Amino acid sequence: MISPLLFDQNISFRIIKEISSHFPGSKQVREVGLEGKLDREVWNYAKSNGFTLVSFDSDFADLSLLFGFPPKVIWLRLGNSSTNRITAVLTQKKEEIQIFLKNEVEGILKVESAL
């Protein structure tokens, strides 16, 4: 089974409504009581609950390099983006993301787009 996504607080909770049909079971940190918590707490929650982290923040990529995975990290390199744009990019890259989530070697996926 492919792990659901856990969106960091720097991504609006509104994305869940838009993305849930493509990535079932996904949540935003606010939904699980982690809004405003330290990155390490979010990391530990994702690890304990089988989520892949999605963030603009390089700190999660740094944690992945330091501690390995799980959790896996999808590092969004899209600049200042609306929820609609983030949804469009993740939907467009759904197959690439699914391949990454099944990959047992890679822990970080950097997502960039010209959308």
Located regions from the model:
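Intrinsically disordered, low-complexity and often Lys/Arg-enriched segments
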Residues: 1-3, 114-115
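N-terminal first-folded block
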Residues: 4-49
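Small/polar loops that bind or transfer phosphate-bearing groups
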Residues: 7-8, 55-56, 78
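Short secondary-structure transition/capping segments
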Residues: 39-41, 65-69
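Short, hinge-like loop/turn segments at secondary-structure boundaries
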Residues: 44-46, 70-74
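Acidic, metal-binding active-site segment of PIN/NYN-like and related structure-specific nucleases
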Residues: 50-64
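C-terminal structural segments of small proteins and small subunits
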Residues: 73-114
